[in-house]
């Protein structure tokens, strides 16, 4: 009995250590994705909303455009062309590019699970969770994640590597955003027509958001 107890104790310790290492590895990898997306954001748009990487970032100090749906913008040269940048555009880039990065490294399933976990985290902890705008933003994020995963899978199976692969990935991300394959703003009408959160493989995510509603007259659907 004493020998069995020692075996159980060692097994429990081994499992505990393994779980701790796995959690640490996932957290470290997630941070690496956030860091690299932030670097790309700063380099391309002159601003990073994930991790501020510059002492002076571009500010949304210019009038709204049709694509920004009433939100302020700023002007920046993006890929050689002047562009009015708005917050939702940055968020869309984060999800498409971040999902593409993850899918190219850990596969589509890993990227899918990682970014779905992010949606649950935001639904639980973000202040505006439970609002209609947050709900549509979640649908937009999930749709953009799917677009990014396809891009990443293509890069993973392609012949390019290193800087060339990264540049091709960014090119594909902008093709998706500019071509309408991805969604630039959660206020677009077509976002409201996207599948339900359950259809995206996120059970109970809608329930969490509904629990966070401060205005019970708002229907999230």
Question: Model regions: which residues?
Answer:
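Intrinsically disordered, low-complexity, mixed-charge
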Residues: 3-221
């Amino acid at each position: 009995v004493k020998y069995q107890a020692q075996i159980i104790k060692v097994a429990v310790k081994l499992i505990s250590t393994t779980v701790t290492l796995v959690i640490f590895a996932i957290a470290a990898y997630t941070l690496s994705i956030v860091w690299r997306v932030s670097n790309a954001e700063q380099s391309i748009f002159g601003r990073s909303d994930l991790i501020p990487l510059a002492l002076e970032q571009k500010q949304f100090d210019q009038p709204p455009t049709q694509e920004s749906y009433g939100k302020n913008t700023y002007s920046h040269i993006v890929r050689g062309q002047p562009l009015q940048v708005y917050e939702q555009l940055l968020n869309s880039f984060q999800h498409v590019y971040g999902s593409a990065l993850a899918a190219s490294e850990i596969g589509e399933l890993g990227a899918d699970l990682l970014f779905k976990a992010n949606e649950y985290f935001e639904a639980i902890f973000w202040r505006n969770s439970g609002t209609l705008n947050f709900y549509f933003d979640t649908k937009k994020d999930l749709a953009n994640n799917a677009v990014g995963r396809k891009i990443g899978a293509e890069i993973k199976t392609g012949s390019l590597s290193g800087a060339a692969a990264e540049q091709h990935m960014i090119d594909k991300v902008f093709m998706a955003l500019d071509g309408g394959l991805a969604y630039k703003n959660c206020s677009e009408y077509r976002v409201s027509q996207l599948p339900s959160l359950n259809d995206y493989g996120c059970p109970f995510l809608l329930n969490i958001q509904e629990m966070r509603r401060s205005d019970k007259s708002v229907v999230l659907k």
